[in-house]
């Protein structure tokens, strides 16, 4: 930690809080995610790190290294100064079809690259897509905590992801192909960019999980009259939002769809993308998998109750103190959200018991 200095707080994510730091020698800005040592360091964290390390693509946040502090595991990664794509949509209300396509093209290229390495993200959403600071922003996929590699693990069965983005087969609690589920989530992302709302939520009752789940299972959505989009775009959405995942459009087919191909930037064409698929492409990280797993293994040991930040300078002590404060706030928020999550689980079970997903 001696080589970094704190710049500012970046907020909280699925597993911990994040901060912006600057490398003291190179002056490079990095994002650092802090995860409390002990019980929070589970297989999801290890999977996120190992999967993330293997990814080398311009539309994916770069993994740099992991660092062990007396109280936390710190994951160091590329900093995307443009913030979340979610914020950009909130500020704009919704995007033009051309702007939505520009970001969708990048999202598809990033997800397709992940799938080529047998890594499914499983929690694709606007909040997990960041932007760099350039005038024509590069989209960067982040947060691989729920991702699952089919090379290392069985097909996913758990219900993970944000309710609004979840595919019907994920709700079924049977084994499903994570690649098909990612395509569905990409479709939800495209819809939100175009419309400024979620496709399967009742705008008058957005927290009604039962209704959202029923609409997902029935593929019940519509494009509002005030949103003017091309027939090609409507066709693509109709091919993505298909209940039977085996009949859903694939990433390979999306990349050949006329709407996707329109104004496709040169760097996103198949010949340009081919360079990233070469297996000999080295990792961005200088840390070996063995070194990372050793550090993660040590992080599973809880922080000592005394002298937790012994040997740290004042800046680092401040970071640890602030991280602890934010985590306390997070725990309070989690307790408040538990009832809603229980309600969500209850409605998922109800949906299973009362209906089978309709055939598409």
Curated annotation (Swiss-Prot):
It comes from the Eukaryota. It comes from Arabidopsis thaliana (Mouse-ear cress). This is Serine/threonine-protein kinase SRK2H. GO terms for cellular component: plastid. It catalyses: L-seryl-[protein] + ATP = O-phospho-L-seryl-[protein] + ADP + H(+); L-threonyl-[protein] + ATP = O-phospho-L-threonyl-[protein] + ADP + H(+). InterPro entries: Kinase-like_dom_sf, Prot_kinase_dom, Protein_kinase_ATP_BS, Ser/Thr_kinase_AS. GO terms for molecular function: ATP binding; kinase activity; mRNA binding; protein serine kinase activity; protein serine/threonine kinase activity. The active site is at residue 123. Residues 344-360 have a biased composition (Basic and acidic residues). Residues 298-360 are annotated as: Disordered. Its EC number is 2.7.11.1. One of its GO terms (biological process) is response to salt stress. Gene3D superfamilies: Phosphorylase Kinase, domain 1, Transferase(Phosphotransferase) domain 1.
């Amino acid at each position: 930690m001696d080589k970094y200095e704190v710049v500012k707080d970046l907020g909280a994510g699925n597993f911990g809080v994040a901060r912006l730091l600057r490398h003291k020698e190179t002056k490079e800005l990095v994002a650092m995610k802090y995860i409390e040592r002990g019980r929070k360091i589970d297989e999801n964290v290890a999977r996120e790190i190992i999967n993330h390390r293997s990814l080398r693509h311009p539309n994916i946040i770069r993994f740099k290294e992991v660092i062990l502090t007396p109280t936390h595991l710190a994951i160091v990664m590329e900093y995307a100064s443009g913030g979340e794509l979610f914020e950009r949509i909130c500020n704009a209300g919704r995007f033009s079809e051309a702007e939505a396509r520009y970001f969708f093209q990048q999202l598809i290229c990033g997800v397709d690259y992940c799938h080529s390495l047998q890594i499914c993200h499983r929690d694709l959403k606007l909040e997990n897509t960041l932007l760099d600071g350039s005038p024509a922003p590069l989209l960067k996929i982040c947060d691989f905590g729920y991702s699952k590699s089919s090379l290392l693990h069985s097909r996913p069965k758990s219900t993970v992801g944000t309710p609004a983005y979840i595919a019907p087969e994920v709700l079924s609690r049977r084994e499903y192909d994570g690649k098909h589920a990612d395509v569905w989530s990409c479709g939800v992302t495209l819809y939100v960019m175009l419309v400024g709302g979620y496709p399967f939520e009742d705008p008058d009752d957005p927290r009604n999980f039962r209704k959202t789940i029923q609409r997902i299972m029935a593929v019940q959505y519509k494009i509002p009259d005030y949103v003017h989009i091309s027939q090609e775009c409507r066709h693509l959405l109709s091919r993505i939002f298909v209940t039977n995942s085996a009949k859903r459009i694939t990433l390979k087919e999306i990349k050949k769809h006329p709407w996707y191909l329109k104004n496709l930037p040169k760097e996103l064409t198949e010949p340009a993308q081919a360079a990233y698929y070469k297996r000999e492409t080295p990792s961005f990280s200088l840390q070996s998998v063995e070194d990372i797993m050793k550090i993660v293994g040590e992080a599973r040991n809880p922080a000592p109750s005394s002298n937790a930040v012994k040997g740290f300078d004042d800046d680092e002590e401040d970071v640890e103190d602030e991280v602890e404060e934010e985590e306390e706030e997070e725990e309070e928020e989690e307790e408040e959200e538990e009832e809603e999550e229980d309600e969500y689980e209850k409605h998922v079970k109800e949906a299973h018991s009362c209906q089978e997903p309709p055939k598409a």
